[in-house]
Swiss-Prot record:
GO MF terms, alphabetically ordered: structural constituent of ribosome
Species annotation: Pseudomonas putida (strain ATCC 47054 / DSM 6125 / CFBP 8728 / NCIMB 11950 / KT2440)
Gene that specifies this protein: rpmG
Name the record gives this protein: Large ribosomal subunit protein bL33
Record bears the keyword Plastid: no
Family: Belongs to the bacterial ribosomal protein bL33 family.
Length: 51
């Protein structure tokens, strides 16, 4: 049961990545440090629903 999710930048730039995750193995929200090209730094990306 893989579900599409959106990883939104915590820097407030509006940049996001889309990915999928297995809801059964990881039921809690994901927080990953990824590169934000708008601010040119690695920042924390938090999971959000795809609208």
């Amino acid at each position: 049961m893989r579900e599409l999710i959106r990883l939104v930048s915590s820097a407030g730039t509006g940049h996001f990545y889309t990915t999928d995750k297995n809801k059964r193995t990881t039921p809690d929200k994901i927080e990953i440090k990824k590169y934000d090209p708008v601010v040119r730094k690695h920042v924390v990306y938090k999971e959000a629903k795809i609208k």
